[in-house]
UniProtKB/Swiss-Prot annotation:
It comes from Mesomycoplasma hyopneumoniae (strain 232) (Mycoplasma hyopneumoniae). The gene is atpD. GO terms for cellular component: plasma membrane; proton-transporting ATP synthase complex. Its EC number is 7.1.2.2. It catalyses: ATP + H2O + 4 H(+)(in) = ADP + phosphate + 5 H(+)(out). The lineage of its organism: Bacteria, Bacillati, Mycoplasmatota, Mycoplasmoidales, Metamycoplasmataceae. This is ATP synthase subunit beta. Produces ATP from ADP in the presence of a proton gradient across the membrane. The catalytic sites are hosted primarily by the beta subunits.
Length: 471
């Protein structure tokens, strides 16, 4: 390439960061890709700072083993670019858009730079169409909007990744559009499992996967979400598609940015995070939107450090989301999955003019009963249920049935649980909870409502437990 005639030399190396001396009049632009060739391999860096006197500081996108001072560095003259278009479907890539699935190299393809401007106000399009997930607790209480941004918040081990995988299974297989999955700083094993699950489910041919896992340097983890988003944007803007973008885990994007910020010598902000946290998050999130050409619906898993929802990383993500789904360790400890906390979760789509009046009223009533149940917990812990008034006893009994009925067997978990996964239509969910609220099933054992899809299945389970309608 002609642009590679601009050659510099490494003058300093510290971990995944290098300083490179270029001629003063030929310093590479910020965000330019630099290339170091060593032992028949190529290491790509991205320019992050100009230090002056012709020296630039750059972040590595892969491991920096075998680097040494004095090595030649080539300015590619362009930003990091990744392949886009139909050739990326059914394939797995790294942050640089290189296939990592052992498949054949891509033929001729289009490449787009990973950095781009967000759509303008005139290009954006608002929508209020509900995205059906088939998961009762989500469809009833936290409905997702097509073209919206959805966050799944939770600490370690409460079921975020399993919920993301179930959403991929339910939505990707039902909606028929294209999907892009970004594995950001998570376990390689989970990526491997997801790849084969999607292959088995027959949705891989409509999906592109991009991974920058937790064993990779911070530069790769910070940019991999942008690589995946670039692929999704092409489908939206040039092929007029409705795209699903799954990101697991958006916290690792922030965490990688924090590591890079420290390596670049920036003074840390609150709780040690980078001072540019809001800017970096905004630049990513504002590109994820619906336009007049197509839509991107994003589902993002958000790790909550030490279960502290006020931590700057999850708190910064909140403001960009249309629906907030909070997973709770206490609910998981009860053995209720998905461990969604209905009282901490919210969605701007839960409005009567969007979901319908009946759906809205049923959802509000469910939340009211669960809220009252929570208020009574301290009294129950001290005095016991017997000391409650008759009306409160009824609330407690009904709330326990509702809480159990919000659980659901997942398709992606059936090989572990042995229970067949369930996809429940919204209308069935609303009608079932409406009947449950009416007291029609107050005499059915509350255990019968655990891990069933519908009321009819709960009745069958109750009969197997020895319950009869005469009871």
């Amino acid at each position: 390439m002609e642009k590679q005639e601009n050659v510099g030399h490494i003058v300093q190396i510290f971990g995944p960061v290098i300083d490179v001396q270029f001629p003063n009049e030929h310093m590479p632009a910020i965000l330019s890709a630099l290339e170091v060739k060593i032992n028949d391999e190529s290491i790509i860096f991205e320019v992050a700072q100009h230090l002056g006197e012709g020296i630039v500081r750059a972040i590595a996108m892969s491991m920096t083993y075998n680097l040494s001072k004095g090595l030649e560095v080539y300015d590619t003259g362009s930003q990091i670019s990744v392949p886009v278009g139909k050739q990326v479907l059914s394939r797995m890539f790294n942050v640089l858009g290189q296939p990592i699935d052992g498949g054949k190299p891509l033929d001729s393809f289009i490449k787009n730079p990973i950095h781009a401007n967000a759509p303008t106000y005139l290009e954006q399009k608002a929508t209020s169409e509900i995205l059906v997930t088939g998961i009762k607790v989500i469809d009833l209480l936290i409905p997702f909007i097509k073209g919206g941004k959805i966050g799944l918040f939770g600490g370690a081990g409460v079921g975020k990744t399993v919920l993301v995988q179930e959403l991929i299974n339910n939505i990707a297989s039902k909606h028929g559009g294209l999907s892009v999955f970004a594995g950001v700083g998570e376990r390689s094993r989970e990526g491997n499992d997801l790849y084969f699950e999607m292959k088995k489910a027959g949705v891989l041919d409509k999906t592109a996967l991009v991974f920058g896992q937790m064993n990779e340097p911070p530069g790769a983890r910070m940019r991999v979400a942008l690589s995946a988003l670039t692929m999704a944007e092409y489908f939206r803007d040039y092929e007029n598609q409705d795209v699903l973008l799954f990101i697991d885990n958006i916290f690792r994007f922030t965490q990688a940015g924090s590591e890079v910020s420290t390596l670049l010598g920036r003074i840390p902000s609150t709780v040690g995070y980078q001072p540019t946290l809001s800017t970096e998050m905004g630049q990513l999130q504002e590109r994820i939107t619906s336009t007049i050409r197509g839509s991107i619906t994003s589902v993002q898993a958000v790790y909550v450090p030490a279960d502290d929802i006020t931590d700057p990383a999850p708190a910064t993500t909140f403001s960009h989301l249309d629906a907030k789904t909070v997973l709770d360790r206490g609910i998981a400890a009860l053995g209720i999955y998905p461990a969604v906390d209905p009282l901490a979760s919210s969605s701007r789509a839960l409005e009567p003019n969007i979901v319908g009046k009946k759906h809205y009223l049923v959802a509000k009533k469910v939340v009211q009963i669960l809220q009252r149940f929570k208020e009574l917990q301290d009294i129950i812990a001290i005095l016991g249920v017997d000391e409650l008034s008759e009306s409160d006893k009824q609330v407690v009994a009904r709330a326990r049935r509702i809480r159990n009925f919000l659980s659901q067997p997942f398709f992606v978990a059936q090989k572990f649980s042995g229970i067949q996964g369930q996809f429940i239509k919204i209308q069935d969910t609303v009608n079932n909870f409406d009947e449950l609220l009416s007291g029609k099933y107050d005499n059915i054992p509350e255990e019968a409502f655990l891990y069933v899809g519908t009321i009819d299945q709960a009745l069958e389970k109750a009969k197997k437990m020895g319950w009869s309608e005469k009871n």
